[in-house]
């Protein structure tokens, strides 16, 4: 078979791919030399690099039909042709049989399709099927338990992935840099809409309960704009960025995140999150947060933006409304009739008419005409066991301080603070002695064991307590991100890459949380002795086992290896019923 002859060709790079162009030489009489002109695109290098297989455009194939019988690859500066057989493959391709690890990625594919993630990705990244590339990198992070992208080519060579073509680290870096804030926000909106639609389909019209919390991600790159030194929650002596997430409590699915400079305190981040949710049209939600995010400003911001909330208020602020309400209800919270049998804590609910400014204007004083009011539910709880544990703990710390003072030993920093807080110093002549101030001890213990949750949505104290307890899901999400997926460090050198990589790590965490939620639900529902026993944190071992289900790939198609015994039960634990012939 005669090898086709090609016209003069040149490779040109665009932001997304390498394209093949024909051209004609023209003579420049002034410079007395030829130059290239009349460029026309005729194909694309499918590898994403300068070298690789070329996919010819239809108009070029119509002009040169003989090219249909060959596979053309660019190697160096040469174009190498290989004849194809009747099936459209070369002889070497027809004889090639490849085995890939496929069970885990097949399961992840099904989870993505069944969740709102799949459609949200297509909505946010429609061009060039980029969502498949992003998804493949996320699978790598999940299964490799590492965010070191240099290991991706080796992993992809042996693993069935949504994007089957090679992705070199430089290509992945380009993908990270191309992920923009607008695409991420489009993903958030589509994800939230999909989640609400799924809830409606099963008759659940309740608002989304979103657990809110933040963590710190350390970085070795000191020159990134957002990397600052702050209160590192992992106690690393490294600069960091702060990452705040919203996680849907029932499904365990993270639906929103935002990064902040490492030196921004938690309480200042919520106002921006509330504004973001309002701007993106994320509605019908109730934010559930810990004490780090409570405060009058955040309550007012939630009310202004029509965002539901359940905030855990700080009980230690002297003279606050929280302490005032506790003092008012202290006797009621000793009444056994106020003790809830399910939560096993004493509880009281007070309705407070909360006055706020719906549209504050800078430097303009608020008046009755401009103010509005909202009825808020202040749920006050008392747990005797927590109060007693705090009392005993304080007594033990006081005893250690007294023992060290008696023996002339030095106090550490915490002990010195306690000495100043609850001891009275006595100086007589040259002698110094200390005695315990019982009033100060009582004051230190006065608000121990109490919790105050405030909400504009949840009027029942028991439901509010349960909704708050479910916020552990966001802590589990951070554990998954940082420990399970190995993303406690950002290995990037520029801010554009940081934006994209953070999103892909968020996506990987979202998919991993679906796996964890499915396994946890399966474990809770299993009552038969024959059920597969599940352990907490078992998702890693489950995916490792499924990853050994192989796919044999050949020129005409593929088939999976036999799935039996334990692996069949693992698929069932994730919600997939396989045919007996599988």
Per-segment meaning from a language model:
Residues 1-221, 244-256, 263, 271, ...:
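Dynamic "connector" segments at or just before major functional cores
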Residues 29, 159-165, 182, 202-203, ...:
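Secondary-structure transition/capping motifs at alpha-helix termini
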Residues 239, 259, 308-467, 537-582:
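An anionic, glycine-rich sequence signature occurring as long contiguous blocks
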Residues 258-280:
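Active-site beta-loop-alpha junctions of metal-dependent nucleic acid enzymes
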Residues 288-297, 315-318, 496-499:
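Acidic, metal-coordinating catalytic cores used for nucleic-acid/nucleotide bond scission
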Residues 464-491:
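Short amphipathic alpha-helical "interface-anchor" segments enriched in bulky aromatics
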Residues 494-515:
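Basic, amphipathic alpha-helical segments enriched in Lys/Arg and hydrophobic/aromatic residues
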Residues 519-533:
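Short, glycine/acidic-rich hinge or "gate" loops at secondary-structure transitions
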């Amino acid at each position: 078979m005669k090898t086709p002859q090609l016209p003069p060709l040149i490779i040109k790079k665009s932001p997304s791919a390498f394209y093949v162009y024909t051209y004609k030489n023209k003579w420049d009489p002034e410079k007395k030399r030829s130059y290239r002109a009349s460029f026309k695109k005729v194909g694309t290098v499918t590898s994403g690099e300068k070298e690789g297989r070329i996919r010819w455009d239809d108009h070029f194939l119509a002009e040169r039909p003989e090219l249909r019988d060959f596979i053309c690859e660019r190697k160096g500066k040469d174009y190498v042709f290989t004849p194809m057989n009747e099936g459209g493959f070369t002889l070497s391709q027809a004889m090639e049989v490849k085995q890939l690890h496929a069970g885990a990625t097949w399961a992840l594919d099904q989870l993505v399709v069944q969740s709102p993630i799949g459609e949200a990705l297509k909505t946010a990244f429609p061009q060039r099927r980029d969502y498949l590339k992003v998804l493949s990198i996320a699978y790598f992070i999940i299964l490799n338990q590492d965010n070191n992208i240099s290991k991706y080519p080796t992993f992809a060579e042996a693993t069935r992935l949504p994007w089957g073509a090679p992705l070199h680290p430089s290509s992945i870096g380009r993908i990270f840099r191309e992920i923009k804030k607008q695409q991420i926000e489009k993903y958030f909106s589509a994800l939230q809409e999909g989640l609400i639609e799924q809830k409606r389909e099963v008759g659940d019209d309740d608002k989304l309960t979103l657990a809110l919390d933040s963590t710190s991600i350390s970085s070795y790159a000191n020159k990134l704009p957002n990397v600052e030194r702050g209160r590192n929650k992992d106690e690393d002596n490294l600069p960091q960025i702060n990452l705040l997430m919203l996680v849907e409590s029932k499904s365990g699915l993270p639906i929103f995140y935002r990064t902040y400079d490492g030196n921004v305190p938690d309480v200042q981040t919520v106002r921006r999150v509330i504004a973001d949710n309002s701007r993106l049209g994320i509605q019908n939600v109730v934010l559930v947060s810990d004490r780090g995010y409570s405060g009058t400003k955040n309550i007012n911001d939630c009310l202004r933006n029509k965002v539901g909330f359940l905030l855990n208020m700080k009980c230690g602020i002297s003279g606050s409304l929280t302490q005032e309400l506790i003092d008012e209800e202290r006797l009621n919270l000793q009444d056994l009739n106020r003790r809830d049998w399910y939560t096993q804590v004493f509880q009281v609910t007070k309705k407070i008419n909360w006055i706020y400014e719906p549209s504050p204007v800078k430097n303009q004083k608020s008046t009755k005409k401009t103010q509005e009011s909202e009825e808020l539910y202040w749920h006050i709880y008392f747990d005797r066991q927590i109060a007693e544990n705090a009392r005993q703990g304080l007594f033990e710390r006081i005893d250690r301080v007294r023992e060290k003072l008696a023996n002339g030993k030095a106090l550490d920093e915490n002990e010195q603070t306690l000495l100043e807080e609850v001891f009275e110093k006595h100086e007589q002549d040259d002698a110094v002695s200390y005695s315990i101030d019982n009033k100060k001890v009582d004051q230190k213990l006065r608000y121990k064991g109490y919790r105050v949750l405030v909400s504009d949505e949840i009027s029942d104290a028991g439901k509010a307590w349960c909704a708050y307890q479910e916020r552990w899901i966001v802590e589990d999400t951070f554990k998954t991100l940082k420990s399970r997926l190995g993303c406690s460090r950002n290995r990037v050198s520029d801010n554009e890459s940081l934006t994209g990589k953070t999103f892909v790590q968020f996506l990987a965490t979202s998919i991993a949380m679906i796996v964890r939620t499915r396994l946890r639900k399966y474990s809770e529902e299993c009552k038969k002795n024959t059920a597969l026993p599940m352990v907490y944190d078992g998702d890693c071992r489950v995916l490792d086992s499924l990853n050994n289900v192989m796919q044999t790939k050949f020129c005409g198609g593929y088939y999976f290896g036999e799935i039996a015994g334990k692996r069949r039960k693992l698929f069932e634990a994730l919600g997939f019923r396989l045919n007996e012939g599988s």
